[in-house]
């Protein structure tokens, strides 16, 4: 099993814009990010999705973090489907870890995608971002942006923006203007794939999502079905996260929609060649070791 902990995205700390000068002049919507699926669920049990902590994911080169939230007695907890199944703690702690990392890395820009299936009040999320010290550095667009209207990374950093926040459901931008509706900006491929060939790049969400106008999220996480229970497949992770496997599905998306996805979500991101793929997909100099 190939496990790597040093990223070309992370080692060039002197370079602006997520470790690469070449990214400074690119629009946010013209970059492909390797992202961590269920980034808060760290461990080796069947319902975990990552081996390394959120800070380690960021050190590794990940700049797109996806995470589930659930309602536990009115509080926002980082729970996997149900809090009795897996509870990684309060949202505040998760955000505080990200905030601490950002404070030590002045030229880095991070995207956070949260779920809110339990329709927790958006004001509670606002409180968590404020208490974690992120509220003053989030992106607040003055209007809904088309794909071509996104600023460059340099423009975002120059404005003091370090974080973009999206939410899948139950956000309210009239109350909290920086938690953006994911599906105003992205479409997603299906998740829960059990075929290691990843044979599809069809639109799963939103129902009428248009890849010709939205940014794309490619779910590249392999699962296995155990007596009707779908769980992350750890055994084939090195193959799933190989540059070949990632590139193959990216090519399928590009041939289907004329554009490569903006985000590739992975489980067990430090296994395989995820960062090599990120370097390659963005046409950047350097290699991952």
Model regions: which residues?
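Fungal secretory targeting signals
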Residues: 1-16
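Catalytic cores of phosphodiester-bond hydrolases, prominently lipid phosphodiesterases
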Residues: 16-289
């Amino acid at each position: 099993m190939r496990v790597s902990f040093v990223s070309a995205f992370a080692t060039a700390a002197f370079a602006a814009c997520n470790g690469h000068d070449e990214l400074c002049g690119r629009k946010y919507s013209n970059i492909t990010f390797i992202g961590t699926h269920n980034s808060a669920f760290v461990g080796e049990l069947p319902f975990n999705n990552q081996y390394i902590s959120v800070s380690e994911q960021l050190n590794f080169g990940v700049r797109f973090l996806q995470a589930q939230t659930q309602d536990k007695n009115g509080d926002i907890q980082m729970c996997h489907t149900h809090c009795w199944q897996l509870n990684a703690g309060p949202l505040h702690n998760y955000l505080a870890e990200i905030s601490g990392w950002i404070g030590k890395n002045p030229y880095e820009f991070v995207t956070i995608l949260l779920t809110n299936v339990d329709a927790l009040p958006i004001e509670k999320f606002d409180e968590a971002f404020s208490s974690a010290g992120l509220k003053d550095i989030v992106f607040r667009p003055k209007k809904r942006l088309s794909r071509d209207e996104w600023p460059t990374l340099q423009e975002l950093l120059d404005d003091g923006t370090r974080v973009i926040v999206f939410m899948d459901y139950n956000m309210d931008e009239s109350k909290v203007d920086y938690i953006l509706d994911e599906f105003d900006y992205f479409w997603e491929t299906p998740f829960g794939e059990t075929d290691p060939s990843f044979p599809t790049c069809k639109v799963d969400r939103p129902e009428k999502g248009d890849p010709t106008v939205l940014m794309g999220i490619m779910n590249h996480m392999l699962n296995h079905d155990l007596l009707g229970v779908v769980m992350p497949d750890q055994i084939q992770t090195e193959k799933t996260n190989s540059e070949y496997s990632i590139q193959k599905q990216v090519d399928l998306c590009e041939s289907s929609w004329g554009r490569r996805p903006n985000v590739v979500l992975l489980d067990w991101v430090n296994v395989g060649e995820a960062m090599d793929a990120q370097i390659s997909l963005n046409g950047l100099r350097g290699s991952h070791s």
